[in-house]
């Protein structure tokens, strides 16, 4: 059931009433007739119709594959649509130029008709929405930044602490798995810190100068 909307319905009062009654009234859809400015009420669910979007003119392959796709689908009902497309693409490549020529001519005729019907048409492909990048949890980012700062400010302390923690963890694992005595030479050795190296150098210099070590 269609209702023609005349020019008086474009008054501000009528437009305001249409906005208020938008949730109750059926959705409004422009007709596809380019020579008419009327609108018609439909029983749609308010979603945008595909009739507003102008389709591209068919190329030679699409013209050829229309009947071929239907034929392959009837002969192979279990075949997926993606497999049918691959098969049609292979069959199209196997055709000779003479066999393809009628479909190129038909595509050219359809393109001319499309150009006359839609003179200002421009192909605008639909862009896929960008997927949001995965972000690290707040705790992980804070922990990573804190470890980076500590390693930058205290390089020797940070490395010594990591070495001690690794050594203690390996000792506990080895003691639980193998109760026998294991030589300490097999375990990773601790690297001396900067303070230990500095202290050893001072003791060595004092011994060479005075003949006996100085107590620090």
Swiss-Prot record:
Species per Swiss-Prot/TrEMBL record: Kogia sima (Dwarf sperm whale)
DNA-binding region per UniProt: 54-122
Gene: SRY
PANTHER family: SEX-DETERMINING REGION Y PROTEIN, SOX TRANSCRIPTION FACTOR
InterPro entries linked to this entry: HMG_box_dom, HMG_box_dom_sf, SRY, SRY-related_HMG-box_TF-like
Protein name per Swiss-Prot or TrEMBL: Sex-determining region Y protein
GO molecular function: calmodulin binding; DNA-binding transcription activator activity, RNA polymerase II-specific; RNA polymerase II cis-regulatory region sequence-specific DNA binding
Principal subcellular localization: nucleus
Example GO biological process: male sex determination
Keywords: Activator, Calmodulin-binding, Cytoplasm, Differentiation, DNA-binding, Nucleus, Repressor, Sexual differentiation, Transcription, Transcription regulation
Database matches in Gene3D superfamilies: High mobility group box domain (1.10.30.10)
Localisation: Nucleus speckle; Cytoplasm; Nucleus
Family: Belongs to the SRY family.
UniProt keyword Repressor present: yes
PROSITE patterns (UniProt xref): HMG_BOX_2
Record's function text: Transcriptional regulator that controls a genetic switch in male development. It is necessary and sufficient for initiating male sex determination by directing the development of supporting cell precursors (pre-Sertoli cells) as Sertoli rather than granulosa cells. Involved in different aspects of gene regulation including promoter activation or repression. Binds to the DNA consensus sequence 5'-[AT]AACAA[AT]-3'. SRY HMG box recognizes DNA by partial intercalation in the minor groove and promotes DNA bending. Also involved in pre-mRNA splicing.
Subunit structure: Interacts with CALM, EP300, HDAC3, KPNB1, ZNF208 isoform KRAB-O, PARP1, SLC9A3R2 and WT1. The interaction with EP300 modulates its DNA-binding activity. The interaction with KPNB1 is sensitive to dissociation by Ran in the GTP-bound form. Interaction with PARP1 impaired its DNA-binding activity.
């Amino acid at each position: 059931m269609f209702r023609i909307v005349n020019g008086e319905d474009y008054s501000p009062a009528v437009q305001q009433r249409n906005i208020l009654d938008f949730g109750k009234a059926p959705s409004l859809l422009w007709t596809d007739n380019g020579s008419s400015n009327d609108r018609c009420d439909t029983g749609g669910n308010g979603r945008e119709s595909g009739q507003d979007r102008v389709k591209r003119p068919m190329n030679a392959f699409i013209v050829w594959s229309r009947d071929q796709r239907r034929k392959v689908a009837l002969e192979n009902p279990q075949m997926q649509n993606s497999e049918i497309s691959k098969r049609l693409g292979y069959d199209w490549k196997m055709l000779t130029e003479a066999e393809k020529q009628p479909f190129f001519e038909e595509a050219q005729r359809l393109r001319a008709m499309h150009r006359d019907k839609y003179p200002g048409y421009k192909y605008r492909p639909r862009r896929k929405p960008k997927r949001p990048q995965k972000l690290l949890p707040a705790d992980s980012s804070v922990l990573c930044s804190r470890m980076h700062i500590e390693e930058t400010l205290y390089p020797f302390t940070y490395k010594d602490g990591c070495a001690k923690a690794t050594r203690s963890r390996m000792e506990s694992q080895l003691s639980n798995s193998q109760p026998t005595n294991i030589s300490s030479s097999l375990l990773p050795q601790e690297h001396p810190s900067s303070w230990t190296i500095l202290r050893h150098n001072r003791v060595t210099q004092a011994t060479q100068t005075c003949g006996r070590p100085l107590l620090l």
